[in-house]
């Protein structure tokens, strides 16, 4: 009898793995990274082939500062083809940069470029990472000397003409006095051709430095005057959390994985708009639009009537909101 018990096969509760994944995604959404990691690890015992599990673990490791573990998970995903390749690759590049493995960043992106695999929406971001990694692996480069040289030899015309140079300028000013460059930064903010994300980064930079003078911004054909030190950061915008609360009651309960994806979409949308706010301010409307666009992105159809059962909106405004989400998403990466 003892022998039989010892060798009996343990049968898990039905759908236990799915419940563990859902709880893990919920904890990840709430930024409870250690709790999420433990749930994902437990789910792995039942099925170690699900891409969401691997990516969720990689993100948890990254947020917990366990970079080598995060690196290992991403390498396995890329090698075995788990998940969306370029989503995983972007996370992997982020990890390598934090590990200061610039040579690996350079060689990896160069290999991808040789195969002409980069999707158009990701190309610019990867080219910037490649250029950055090449600079960081330059044998003649010395960190402090390079930073000082950049500051002393800045070419205003070159900066105004190049998003890459604008990014370099912003990063170089993170821990420096911005006073010398506020004129240039303000010029970029009013330049119709400057990328909206660059403008967001400049406003946030000025806010971090508690810059309190009026700043004029042009974005998406609109103009706005703000005092950077007084504005609310995009991740604290009331519309962000009002929409997510509504969406959590519907999509969050129905499909936590998809909820996490559209939450990130909504955060990116507001980040690109910042410091502007959406013209339409109905939380129900934006929750419905995110629900619909999220389904479409994953190849799922949902009828307007079904959305009307969960949210209050007009069809005309829903179409407008969905178009806005898609248009902003197309330019939401540098």
Swiss-Prot record:
Whereabouts are the TPR repeats? 17-50, 52-84, 195-230
Query: What's the name of the protein?
Result: TPR repeat-containing protein YsoA
- InterPro entries annotated for this entry? TPR-like_helical_dom_sf (IPR011990), TPR_rpt (IPR019734)
Q: Which domain of life is it from?
A: Bacteria
Alphabetic keyword roster: Repeat, TPR repeat
Task: State the Gene3D superfamilies in the record.
Answer: Tetratricopeptide repeat domain
């Amino acid at each position: 009898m003892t022998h039989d018990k010892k060798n009996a096969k343990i049968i898990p509760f039905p759908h236990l793995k799915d419940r563990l994944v859902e709880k893990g995604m919920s904890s990840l959404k709430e930024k409870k990274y250690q709790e999420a990691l433990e749930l994902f690890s437990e789910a792995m015992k039942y099925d170690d082939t699900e891409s969401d599990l691997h990516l969720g673990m990689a993100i948890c490791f990254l947020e917990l500062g366990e970079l080598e573990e995060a690196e290992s998970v991403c390498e396995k995903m890329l090698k075995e083809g788990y998940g969306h390749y370029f989503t995983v690759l972007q996370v992997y590049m982020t990890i390598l940069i934090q590990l200061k493995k610039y040579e690996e960043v350079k060689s990896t992106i160069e290999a991808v470029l040789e195969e002409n695999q980069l999707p158009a929406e990701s190309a610019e971001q990867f080219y910037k990472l490649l250029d950055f990694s090449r600079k960081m692996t330059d044998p003649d480069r010395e960190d402090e000397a390079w930073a000082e040289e950049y500051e002393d030899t800045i070419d205003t015309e070159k900066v105004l003409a190049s998003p890459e140079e604008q990014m370099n300028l912003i990063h170089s000013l993170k821990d420096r006095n911005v006073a010398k460059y506020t004129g240039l930064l303000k010029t970029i903010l009013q330049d119709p051709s400057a990328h909206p994300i660059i403008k967001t980064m400049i406003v946030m930079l000025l806010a971090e430095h508690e810059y309190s003078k009026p700043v004029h911004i042009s974005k998406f054909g609109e103009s706005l005057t703000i005092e950077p030190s007084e504005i609310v950061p995009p991740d604290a915008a009331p519309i962000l959390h009002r929409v997510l609360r509504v969406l959590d009651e519907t999509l969050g309960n129905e499909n936590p994985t998809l909820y996490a994806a559209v939450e990130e979409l909504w955060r990116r949308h507001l980040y690109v708009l910042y410091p502007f706010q959406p013209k339409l301010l109905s939380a129900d409307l934006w929750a419905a639009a995110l629900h619909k666009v999220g389904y479409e992105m994953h190849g799922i159809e949902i009828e307007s009537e079904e959305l009307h059962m969960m949210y209050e909106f007009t069809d005309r405004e829903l179409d407008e909101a969905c178009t806005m989400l898609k248009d902003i998403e197309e330019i939401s990466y540098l």
